[in-house]
């Protein structure tokens, strides 16, 4: 990593990975409450990704459901 943008890009990738991981496990929960917690955590990670994307001046995704796909 050579600059601030490199650090932000890494954080952005990690946040998207975390969101996708939380989304990916939702179907495996038999307990609805656990699924809800996972969905809330995913939403939180997406907010982090959004802030990092804004800091990097990246455009918003063209497709609506770009997470968990």
Describe each model-derived feature in a short phrase.
Residues 1-69:
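All-alpha RGS (Regulator of G-protein Signaling) helical domain and cognate RGS-like helical scaffolds
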């Amino acid at each position: 990593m050579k600059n601030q943008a490199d650090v932000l890009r890494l954080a952005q990738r990690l946040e998207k990975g975390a969101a996708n991981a939380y989304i990916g496990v939702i179907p495996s929960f038999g307990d609805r409450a656990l699924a809800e917690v996972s969905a809330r955590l995913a939403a939180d990670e997406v907010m982090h990704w959004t802030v990092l994307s804004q800091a990097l001046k990246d455009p918003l995704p063209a497709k609506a459901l770009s997470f968990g796909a």
